[in-house]
From Swiss-Prot:
This is Iron-sulfur cluster insertion protein ErpA. Transmembrane segments: none annotated. Homodimer. The gene is erpA. Its cofactor is iron-sulfur cluster. Pfam families: Fe-S_biosyn (PF01521). One of its GO terms (cellular component) is cytosol. Binds 1 iron-sulfur cluster per subunit. Keywords: Iron, Iron-sulfur, Metal-binding. InterPro entries: FeS_biogenesis (IPR000361), FeS_cluster_insertion (IPR016092), FeS_cluster_insertion_RrpA (IPR023063), HesB-like_dom_sf (IPR035903).
Amino acid sequence: MNHPTRLPLDFTEAAARKFKELIANEHNSNKKLRVYVEGGGCNGFKYMFTLDDKVNEGDLAINKQGVSLVVDPLSLGYLIGGIVDYVESIEYSRFIVKNLNAKTTCGCGSSFSV
């Protein structure tokens, strides 16, 4: 019986669509969406997103809808089992991480503790 392989980190169709829109504005289809974790925020760690031109040695690259999400090995340790999404509301529009490893998150969802 074949079971689909679960990725250590995934991203939603909404995140892929928004990222496609961002790289179209950059006029550079080689850009990747990099998600990483750094110290800070009100809970000790915060999620960061940037457009990147390269995949570094050891990075995990996940492709969907013709775009790539990349994450470094250290950050991946905090993000395993997570899902990167893009949400829009009256208050904000942003990429978020649904992180199964987070013990607590701040009200805005951009920082967490483990």
